[in-house]
Amino acid sequence: MTNSGYNVIVIGGGHAGTEAASAAARLGAKTALVTHRRDTIGVMSCNPAIGGLGKGHLVREIDAMDGLMGRVADVAGIQFRMLNRKKGAAVRGPRTQADRKLYRLAMLAAIEATPGLDIIEGDAFDLDVLDGRVAGVIMKDGRRLQAPAVVLTTGTFLRGLIHIGSEKTPAGRVGEAPSIGLSATLARLGLRLGRLKTGTPARLDGKTIDWQSVGRQGADEELVPFSFMTDSITTRQVECGVTRTTEATHRIIVDNIKHSAMYSGQIEGVGPRYCPSIEDKLVKFGERDGHQVFLEPEGLDDDTVYPNGISTSLPAEIQAAFIKTIPGLESARILQPGYAIEYDHVDPRELTPSLEVKRLRGLFLAGQINGTTGYEEAAAQGLAAGLNAALLSSDSEPFHFSRTSSYIGVMIDDLTSRGVTEPYRMFTSRAEYRLTLRADNADMRLTPLAMALGCVGAERAERFTAYQAEIDAGRAQLMALTVTPNEARRAGLNINLDGQRRSAYDFLSYPTYDFAALRKVWPEELGRLRPKVAEALEIEAGYSVYLDRQAAAIADQQRDEERRIPADFNYDALSGLSNELKAKLSAARPFNVAQAAIVEGMTPAAVALLLVHLRRQQGFERQSADTRSESL
């Protein structure tokens, strides 16, 4: 049976798939979301949390494009915390523990409420390809779904294999079959495939934990939502427990490490560097006498606890033994053993910046299939792939997230230009311009682009336009309120007596002054600003000097990406560059700096070194040419 009439088909109902389907539908594409089971849409397969350092920035950017993750997390969040709250705004990371059930139900409700989006239950087995481009999807039961654009968001399901000690079980996650047919399809297309792995800890019965003997970590007093559309958090907040592994824990693990699937040679996939198993921690950091374990409740009406920090692939009986040596867990009962899962992924260098496969028009990939790890990274790719699939289906130009204006752009550029050798995770350190790419200004950076693209709903557009007007009016007011140095000193603002008038905005750029200090000088004028607007302007003004410099640097980078490299450029003479990079650049012979930047292994530091050398060399050549002309 053939179904016609879809513009976009999304395969997979996880974090990438839900954002992809929603994004495509918001652009007006008739969209089908294909999933094994409707009730698994939005399932949190691993840890019950959203956001964090770098990751929280991605959630805010998804929200700025009118995506779903931020709003759903605000409904399901049961412990909101702003990480790095005491540090600068650029590195603060919004995060929440989430109730798994609430999150899944809220995401399903959001998908079901999206106009133009159908949910189709079943197993996508193969792609329908016609004249060198995607024509639809072939289901395992023989159904054919037709569409000019398909987004694959298969997560860990591509030839997924779960490991618990020596036991191996084909699965995409516990209790769900892997996807074998699509993996074969990708290999048949000639795409470069690799094998990665991730892992998860045992799930514990919270009723058997001695909560009195562990530390506690609660939510912040001031709960900061993810979404621009959320006015306040109303879900009840809970505490997490905090404990540590012991020498006895380590002894059991080390004595039995040969039984770990990771260390027995049974697993061929590469694991995530920044989310190591407890076995990895002991091998790499054996000198430590303990490792922190966060006991994270999985829901308000669920006694299951996720012990974050002890991911493992040891046999179940050894897991039970080492868990009982951790303070507070002496009597803990395991509900589900921890496990490692390995799966196929596609080399993301097979993709364009729109996440379309170069070898097959109309096929887009998003999420762990591209070598990333994490809900937020997957969701951000799903957003980009869904938008571009919808644009392709209407013969429109693709939309590319820029590296200079979004963390989504940083991630996609990293993936498509450099590829991955291990699961990719977002950090603020990956962005060259993180003072500009803050979590607090994601809406100001991206919502105007989303509105121009047409993927923002009327309510958000109206609220954002009003907010932007408030910001502009507030900024103008701050710049109009000025005082002389003597007037400032009389008001308690200690500045140099240099005769120059300074505005309220100028004072906010100084680290010693904030709105509280300025309201003593201008109580009536500044008292009218909403707290959210005042906070945004305070951060903006505080960074203003640096942002001006960074804006210039961004413009410089865009120019430098077009800078030509001489065909006979001698990379071996470039001191400070590794021998490996010298060899790769000499072999690739990039035409310009933009091409050099995507050579495998190139880092921002290496690009900067190349630019300095080229500027110096080309400046010398211009100077020599000028000297020759003068002598003539």
UniProtKB/Swiss-Prot annotation:
Biological source species: Rhizobium etli (strain ATCC 51251 / DSM 11541 / JCM 21823 / NBRC 15573 / CFN 42)
Function comment: NAD-binding protein involved in the addition of a carboxymethylaminomethyl (cmnm) group at the wobble position (U34) of certain tRNAs, forming tRNA-cmnm(5)s(2)U34.
GO biological process, one term: tRNA methylation
Protein name: tRNA uridine 5-carboxymethylaminomethyl modification enzyme MnmG
A Pfam family that the UniProt record links to this protein: GIDA_C_1st
GO cellular component: cytosol
Cofactor: FAD
Coiled coil: none
